[in-house]
């Protein structure tokens, strides 16, 4: 027998290296075979529900890090809730309609004009489903547990039917109407756009200052006076019908010495504009208030038969420009609103594709609108109206899909009225919790500021607007027609709209006063895709009987304040009178390491599968918890390497716990809490506090603090303290000694509790650990989270002084470690086991040590220890608060078994190289060695 055969060296087949890229795939196959998601749902039947409603990602392209951050966050929450007494079904969804899919088919060579609309839509559907399959596999590889076989898709017949019914409810309330209003118009998509589909970029536009001669000054202005107008869109001047000013702004009539004309502009802006225009010796003839200029008329600068009306509006400022704004009612929202008050005509001199029409005049017709800027400038120069041209940098709206600029353009569109229910929406919003807190203000401000929602789109891949037209052109939207269309969509899908004539889409025998001859036509526009996803509260939550409405939680990126959070709130309040969610949590965007947006064109993307193939999904999942996702998150390879190091620390700690409980049976070997060694009972208390804190963080979706506490517990409480001195007990003491079984009891409890607590974050690793634990559940996912009172007997909770006593001891320990380090640096000792400590403590510290009743020498890993009064400390002792420490080399010889330096080595003649403790343990447990001795190796 060898000496090491007498040691209880831990053994486990749990590998130090995770080999996650390979093992995770096998683990996921096992989950699928055992129907893990379904098993958890069955286990939780009858329990309170927790519903996290999945915001549908767009079905186009492989998943990216933003997807990973979001889906893993949701999975962590749902897994935790499922292990915490809740029935928490998770139904994933996809947004499957919209322009990008149409564009992909066009790129692939399909010509929409050479096939029927229904045929083109079939191709769109086929493409979307392939994208769903691709993304689904990506999410599954991340370890996300969900109802993958029955997701919700906005193209599914039942979803489309529910969407139509929401539209019908809104129509019943008089919230749906048709109007000709300026809307965001994407010439690159040839369709109207909602606010949520627009993003802003900084651009440089041609800025023009020009004069318009007064025709009728209403007794306030002379006809030799020119109104100085400013615009950043000269191409819109052919659509100009008026000039807007502010009633409360003071305007000056000025005469430059170097110009024969008089000019009107805001008094506060005279000086800066005079310098820019090159005016000399400017004389202020008089000032008037804006209200006095109401209904003054002026001559259009290059359209001879058009007179412009001066109007009062509330959107004019003196922050820039001249205080007079060129107004084209057909080409701007503010322009339209003020023009309507003055009954101005609405000219739209630009077509669907962005080309100027004949309405703009012969010189403009057929010219792309951006090129029309120069024509307008040339005409202003020719009319001697242009005072100044200069480039102007400002923020401008772009189509978020095509990345091309959009324009405002008045077209006939269908709208959902927000104004009629604005107060109702805001009232419902007050009862919703937000994380971060500012989210409520942000969404409320968006609701306050947004106009009515343009819900129609001039595309084909989407849900048709269920609207018919009579022979007189009047729209027909009745409960009867809407319900019938919804029933048809539920049975056949929305493609039926494009396959049947209008009469075949109406209820049998339907009649209308608008069609005395029974002839009907149908709407060709589709609904905004935000209306699709925005009605998921009915298409999913209300549709599936195992879900609940409203949802407990919506969790998405911060861009969804103007997107899904917004559209869902409007449709839900409109159709049901309730907000669709009880709580909203928002996350930031994923950026590259330098804080830039990730894009393929910049070559700065890191794809989830890139990390997974090298490090594993659990590394990506752990990374998600390590960042503050409430703000924008930077992604880098270095960050994942760092997380991998943290994972290794956790894995190695779990390996140590498993190895040293491999000979421990919790059913027969566990020590009762009352009989645990003091230090073990303390660690059970620490585990209890750790579990309590981590569970609170889970409850508040505070992943970052879970990560911090997890790593701190593993590194500080376990590795740097408890596990640090554990070998002297676990390896050296007799295998079944009470002191060793006491520590194993706590080791095992730590392993079980820690495994449960990390399961929502690291499900693959947790299941691998669980295989080595002797617990009744086959899978840790089917276990429950550790309850706090499960860890420490309710009657054995430490008193208030417990933690302060241990805090004091840990401070003492840190001082001792510093003293040992200095002794090593001075070559006094090689390692702590060669040291003897003399501790000189005050009365309070002595009392605390007695109270703790722990083996201080063993915890400090030294060979000898004496404790004396602080006033006996020698001059060369290292002093600290309440403590002095003197380190000397331990006397005696090194024990071949425990490696401590002891004076009693050889006291048992049968074991000449063992200390008395080791000799006694070996003699009792391996009596044959007393006569046979040991082999050399």
Swiss-Prot record:
<dbReference type="Pfam" id="PF08264">
    <property type="entry name" value="Anticodon_1"/>
</dbReference>
<dbReference type="GO" id="GO:0002161">
    <property type="term" value="F:aminoacyl-tRNA deacylase activity"/>
</dbReference>
<feature type="short sequence motif" description="'HIGH' region">
    <location>
        <begin position="57"/>
        <end position="67"/>
    </location>
</feature>
<comment type="subunit">
    <text>Monomer.</text>
</comment>
<keyword id="KW-0067">ATP-binding</keyword>
<dbReference type="Pfam" id="PF00133">
    <property type="entry name" value="tRNA-synt_1"/>
</dbReference>
<feature type="binding site">
    <location>
        <position position="918"/>
    </location>
    <ligand>
        <name>Zn(2+)</name>
    </ligand>
</feature>
<dbReference type="InterPro" id="IPR033708">
    <property type="entry name" value="Anticodon_Ile_BEm"/>
</dbReference>
<feature type="short sequence motif" description="'KMSKS' region">
    <location>
        <begin position="597"/>
        <end position="601"/>
    </location>
</feature>
<dbReference type="GO" id="GO:0005829">
    <property type="term" value="C:cytosol"/>
</dbReference>
<dbReference type="GO" id="GO:0006428">
    <property type="term" value="P:isoleucyl-tRNA aminoacylation"/>
</dbReference>
<dbReference type="InterPro" id="IPR009080">
    <property type="entry name" value="tRNAsynth_Ia_anticodon-bd"/>
</dbReference>
<keyword id="KW-0547">Nucleotide-binding</keyword>
<dbReference type="InterPro" id="IPR014729">
    <property type="entry name" value="Rossmann-like_a/b/a_fold"/>
</dbReference>
<dbReference type="GO" id="GO:0000049">
    <property type="term" value="F:tRNA binding"/>
</dbReference>
<keyword id="KW-0479">Metal-binding</keyword>
<dbReference type="InterPro" id="IPR002301">
    <property type="entry name" value="Ile-tRNA-ligase"/>
</dbReference>
<dbReference type="InterPro" id="IPR001412">
    <property type="entry name" value="aa-tRNA-synth_I_CS"/>
</dbReference>
<feature type="binding site">
    <location>
        <position position="895"/>
    </location>
    <ligand>
        <name>Zn(2+)</name>
    </ligand>
</feature>
<dbReference type="InterPro" id="IPR050081">
    <property type="entry name" value="Ile-tRNA_ligase"/>
</dbReference>
<dbReference type="InterPro" id="IPR023585">
    <property type="entry name" value="Ile-tRNA-ligase_type1"/>
</dbReference>
<feature type="binding site">
    <location>
        <position position="898"/>
    </location>
    <ligand>
        <name>Zn(2+)</name>
    </ligand>
</feature>
<dbReference type="GO" id="GO:0004822">
    <property type="term" value="F:isoleucine-tRNA ligase activity"/>
</dbReference>
<keyword id="KW-0436">Ligase</keyword>
<comment type="function">
    <text>Catalyzes the attachment of isoleucine to tRNA(Ile). As IleRS can inadvertently accommodate and process structurally similar amino acids such as valine, to avoid such errors it has two additional distinct tRNA(Ile)-dependent editing activities. One activity is designated as 'pretransfer' editing and involves the hydrolysis of activated Val-AMP. The other activity is designated 'posttransfer' editing and involves deacylation of mischarged Val-tRNA(Ile).</text>
</comment>
<keyword id="KW-0862">Zinc</keyword>
<dbReference type="GO" id="GO:0005524">
    <property type="term" value="F:ATP binding"/>
</dbReference>
<protein>
    <recommendedName>
        <fullName>Isoleucine--tRNA ligase</fullName>
        <ecNumber>6.1.1.5</ecNumber>
    </recommendedName>
</protein>
<feature type="binding site">
    <location>
        <position position="600"/>
    </location>
    <ligand>
        <name>ATP</name>
    </ligand>
</feature>
<comment type="similarity">
    <text>Belongs to the class-I aminoacyl-tRNA synthetase family. IleS type 1 subfamily.</text>
</comment>
<feature type="binding site">
    <location>
        <position position="556"/>
    </location>
    <ligand>
        <name>L-isoleucyl-5'-AMP</name>
    </ligand>
</feature>
<dbReference type="GO" id="GO:0008270">
    <property type="term" value="F:zinc ion binding"/>
</dbReference>
<dbReference type="InterPro" id="IPR009008">
    <property type="entry name" value="Val/Leu/Ile-tRNA-synth_edit"/>
</dbReference>
<feature type="binding site">
    <location>
        <position position="915"/>
    </location>
    <ligand>
        <name>Zn(2+)</name>
    </ligand>
</feature>
<dbReference type="InterPro" id="IPR002300">
    <property type="entry name" value="aa-tRNA-synth_Ia"/>
</dbReference>
<keyword id="KW-0963">Cytoplasm</keyword>
<dbReference type="Pfam" id="PF06827">
    <property type="entry name" value="zf-FPG_IleRS"/>
</dbReference>
<keyword id="KW-0030">Aminoacyl-tRNA synthetase</keyword>
<dbReference type="InterPro" id="IPR013155">
    <property type="entry name" value="M/V/L/I-tRNA-synth_anticd-bd"/>
</dbReference>
<keyword id="KW-0648">Protein biosynthesis</keyword>
<dbReference type="InterPro" id="IPR010663">
    <property type="entry name" value="Znf_FPG/IleRS"/>
</dbReference>
């Amino acid at each position: 027998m060898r000496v090491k055969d007498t040691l209880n060296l831990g053994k486990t087949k749990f590998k130090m290296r995770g080999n996650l890229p390979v093992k995770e795939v096998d683990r996921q196959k096992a989950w699928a075979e055992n129907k893990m998601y379904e098993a958890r749902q069955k286990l939780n039947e009858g329990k309170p529900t927790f519903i996290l409603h999945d915001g549908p990602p767009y079905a186009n392209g492989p998943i990216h890090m933003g997807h990973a951050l979001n889906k893993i966050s949701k999975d962590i929450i749902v897994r935790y809730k499922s292990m915490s007494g809740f029935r928490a079904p998770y139904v994933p969804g996809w947004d499957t309609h919209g322009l990008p899919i149409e564009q992909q088919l066009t790129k692939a060579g399909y010509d929409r004009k050479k096939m029927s609309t229904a045929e083109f839509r079939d191709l769109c559907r086929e493409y979307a489903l392939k994208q769903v399959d691709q993304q689904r596999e990506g999410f599954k590889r991340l370890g996300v547990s969900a109802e993958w076989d029955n997701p919700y898709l906005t193209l599914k017949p039942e979803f489309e039917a529910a969407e139509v019914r929401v539209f019908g409810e809104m129509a019943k309330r008089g919230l749906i109407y048709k109007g000709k209003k300026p809307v965001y118009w994407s010439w690159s998509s040839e369709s109207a756009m909602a606010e949520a589909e627009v993003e802003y970029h900084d651009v440089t536009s041609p800025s023009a200052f020009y004069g318009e001669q007064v025709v009728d000054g209403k007794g306030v202005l002379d006809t030799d006076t020119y109104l100085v107008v400013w615009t950043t869109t000269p191409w819109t001047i052919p659509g100009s019908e008026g000039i807007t000013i502010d009633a409360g702004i003071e305007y000056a009539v000025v005469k430059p010495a170097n110009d024969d004309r008089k000019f009107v502009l805001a008094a506060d802006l005279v000086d800066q504009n005079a310098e820019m225009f090159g005016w000399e010796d400017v004389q202020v003839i008089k000032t008037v208030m804006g209200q006095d200029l109401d209904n003054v008329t002026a001559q259009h600068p290059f359209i001879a038969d058009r007179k412009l009306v001066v109007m009062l509006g509330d959107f004019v400022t003196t922050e820039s420009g001249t205080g007079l704004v060129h107004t084209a009612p057909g080409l701007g929202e503010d322009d339209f609103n003020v023009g309507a008050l003055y009954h101005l005509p609405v000219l739209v001199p630009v077509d669907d594709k962005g080309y100027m029409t004949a309405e703009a005049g012969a010189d403009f017709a057929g010219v792309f609108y951006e090129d029309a800027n120069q024509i307008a400038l040339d005409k202003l120069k020719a009319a001697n109206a242009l005072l100044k041209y200069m480039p102007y940098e400002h923020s401008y709206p772009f189509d978020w899909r095509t990345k091309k600029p959009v324009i405002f353009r008045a077209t006939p569109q269908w709208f959902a009225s927000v104004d009629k229910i604005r107060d109702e929406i805001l009232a419902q919003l007050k009862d919703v919790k937000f994380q971060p807190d500012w989210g409520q203000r942000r969404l409320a401000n968006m609701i306050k500021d947004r106009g009515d929602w343009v819900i129609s789109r001039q595309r084909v891949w989407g849900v048709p607007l269920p609207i018919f037209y009579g022979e007189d052109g009047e729209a027909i939207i009745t409960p009867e027609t809407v319900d019938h269309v919804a029933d048809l969509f539920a049975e056949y899908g929305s493609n039926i709209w494009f396959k049947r004539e209008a009469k075949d889409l109406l209820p049998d025998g339907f009649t209308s006063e608008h069609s005395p001859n029974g002839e009907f036509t149908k709407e060709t526009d589709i609904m905004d895709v935000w209306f699709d996803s925005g009605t998921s509260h009915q298409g999913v939550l209300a549709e599936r009987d195992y879900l609940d409405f409203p949802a407990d939680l919506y969790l998405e990126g911060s861009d969804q304040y103007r997107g899904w959070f917004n559209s869902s709130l409007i449709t839900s309040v409109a159709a049901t009178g309730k907000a669709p969610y009880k709580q909203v949590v928002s996350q930031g965007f994923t950026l590259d390491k330098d804080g830039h947006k990730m894009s393929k064109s910049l070559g700065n993307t890191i794809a989830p599968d890139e990390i997974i193939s090298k490090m594993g999904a659990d590394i990506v999942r752990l990374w998600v918890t390590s960042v503050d996702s409430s703000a924008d998150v930077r992604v880098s390879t270095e960050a994942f390497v760092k997380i991998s190091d943290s994972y290794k620390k956790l894995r190695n700690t779990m390996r140590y716990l498993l190895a040293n409980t491999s000979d421990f049976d919790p059913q027969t070997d566990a020590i009762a809490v009352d009989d645990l060694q003091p230090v073990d009972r303390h660690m059970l208390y620490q585990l209890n506090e750790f579990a309590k804190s981590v569970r609170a963080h889970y409850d508040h979706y505070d992943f970052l603090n879970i990560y911090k506490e997890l790593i701190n517990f593993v590194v500080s409480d376990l590795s740097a303290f408890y596990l640090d001195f554990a070998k002297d007990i676990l390896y050296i003491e007799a295998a079944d000694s009470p002191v060793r079984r006491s520590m194993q009891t706590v080791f095992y409890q730590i392993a079980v509790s820690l495994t449960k607590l990390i399961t929502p974050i690291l499900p693959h690793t947790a299941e691998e650990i669980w295989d080595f634990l002797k617990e009744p559940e086959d899978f840790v996912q089917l276990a429950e989270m550790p309850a706090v009172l499960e860890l420490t007997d309710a009657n054995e909770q430490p008193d208030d002084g417990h933690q302060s006593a241990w805090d004091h001891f840990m401070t003492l320990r840190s001082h001792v470690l510093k003293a040992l380090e200095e002794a090593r640096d001075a070559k006094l000792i090689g390692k702590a086991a060669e040291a003897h400590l003399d501790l000189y403590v005050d009365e309070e510290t002595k009392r605390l040590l007695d109270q703790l009743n722990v083996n201080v020498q063993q915890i400090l890993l030294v060979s000898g220890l004496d404790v004396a009064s602080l006033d006996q400390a020698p001059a060369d002792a290292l002093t600290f608060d309440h403590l002095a420490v003197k380190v000397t080399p331990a006397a005696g010889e090194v024990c071949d078994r425990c490696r401590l330096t002891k004076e009693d080595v050889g006291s048992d003649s049968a074991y000449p190289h063992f200390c008395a403790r080791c000799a006694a343990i070996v003699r009792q447990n391996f009596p044959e060695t007393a006569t046979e001795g040991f082999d050399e190796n």
